[in-house]
Curated annotation (Swiss-Prot):
Name of this chain's protein: Urease subunit gamma
Originating species: Nostoc punctiforme (strain ATCC 29133 / PCC 73102)
SUPFAM superfamilies: Urease, gamma-subunit
Keyword Hydrolase: yes
A Pfam family of this chain: Urease_gamma
GO biological process entries: urea catabolic process
Transmembrane feature ranges: none
Length: 100
C-alpha cells in the first residue's frame, strides 16, 4: 500500500486518537499528545461528514473538559490546528482554547 505523507499523518492521528478514546473510556486522564490527537481526529471526521469550518471550530471546544485531562494540560493547549479535507477542498480548522 502506497500512502502519501499526509495520509500517513492522518493514520497516525487516528491511531493515537483511538488509544486516547479507549483510555478516556476507562476513566484515565489524557496527556498532551492524547488530547491533541482526540480533538484532531474528531475535526478530521467532522470534515469528512460534511460539517463546516465554523461548526467544527465550535464542536472542537465541546470534546474535552478539564476533568478529562491531566493537570496543566488545558493551560498548555491554546490552539489546535488541523488541515482537514472538505468537499470543496482542504482548509485549516483552528480551535481556540479547546479544553474548558
Amino acid at each position: 500500500m502506497q500512502l502519501t505523507p499526509q495520509e500517513k499523518d492522518k493514520l497516525l492521528i487516528f491511531t493515537a486518537a483511538l488509544l486516547a478514546e479507549r483510555r478516556k473510556g476507562r476513566g484515565l486522564k489524557l496527556n498532551y499528545p492524547e488530547a491533541i490527537a482526540y480533538i484532531s481526529a474528531a475535526i478530521l471526521e467532522g470534515a469528512r461528514d460534511g460539517q463546516t469550518v465554523a461548526e467544527l471550530m465550535s464542536y472542537g471546544t465541546t470534546l474535552l473538559t478539564r476533568d478529562d485531562v491531566m493537570e496543566g494540560i488545558p493551560e498548555m493547549v491554546h490552539d489546535v490546528q488541523v488541515e482537514a479535507t472538505f468537499p470543496d477542498g482542504t482548509k485549516l480548522v483552528t480551535v481556540h482554547n479547546p479544553i474548558r
